[in-house]
């Protein structure tokens, strides 16, 4: 396992669409493990493969309920609406309010290649949407309805 460098805004890899994983081999599992390690080191709640310069549809998330590894994640259902503050490891120091679904259902493959589904609400729904956006080259700043100033940022926990 290795810590990977997190690509920052301006790096074109963040604007590219990641390709589906066609074979879950040891290379893919190593990338997932590196992503998890990199996410934890940076105190993030999620990371998409684009952020470490890999254009494959891989996401890791941990909102405090354990590590989720998602291969080829896809939103299959969404419901409601929430507006909340969001940040991104690729855009340090910026926090913006983003409108997201209140609840989402995501279909994905686990590391054994088994098809699974996860339902997320609130922070988990937000993290799932944020990371899947990354796989499509979309950043939260594209969707932010308002950016927070320094004083407001101190009162908000970044996600
Ligand atoms: Zn991000």
Swiss-Prot record:
EC number(s) on file = 3.5.1.88
Binding-site positions, Fe cation: 88, 130, 134
Looking at the Swiss-Prot or TrEMBL record, what is one Pfam family this protein matches?
Pep_deformylase
Positions of transmembrane segments: none
What this protein needs as a cofactor is: Fe(2+)
Belongs to which family? Belongs to the polypeptide deformylase family.
Q: State the protein's name.
A: Peptide deformylase
Organism for this UniProt entry: Thermoanaerobacter pseudethanolicus (strain ATCC 33223 / 39E)
């Amino acid at each position: 396992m290795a810590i990977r460098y997190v690509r920052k805004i301006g790096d074109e890899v963040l604007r590219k669409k990641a390709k589906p994983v066609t074979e879950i081999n040891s290379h893919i599992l190593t990338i997932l493990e590196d992503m998890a390690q990199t996410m934890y080191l940076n105190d993030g709640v999620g990371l998409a493969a684009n952020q470490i310069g890999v254009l494959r549809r891989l996401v890791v998330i941990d909102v405090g309920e354990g590590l989720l590894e998602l291969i080829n994640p896809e939103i299959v259902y969404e419901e409601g609406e929430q507006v909340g503050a969001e940040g991104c490891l690729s855009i340090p120091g910026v926090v913006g309010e983003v409108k997201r679904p209140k609840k989402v259902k995501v279909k994905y493959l686990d590391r054994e290649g088994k098809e699974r589904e996860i339902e997320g609400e609130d922070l988990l729904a937000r993290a799932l949407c944020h990371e899947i956006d990354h796989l499509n080259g979309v950043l939260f700043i594209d969707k932010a309805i308002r950016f927070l100033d320094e004083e407001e940022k101190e009162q908000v926990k970044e996600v």
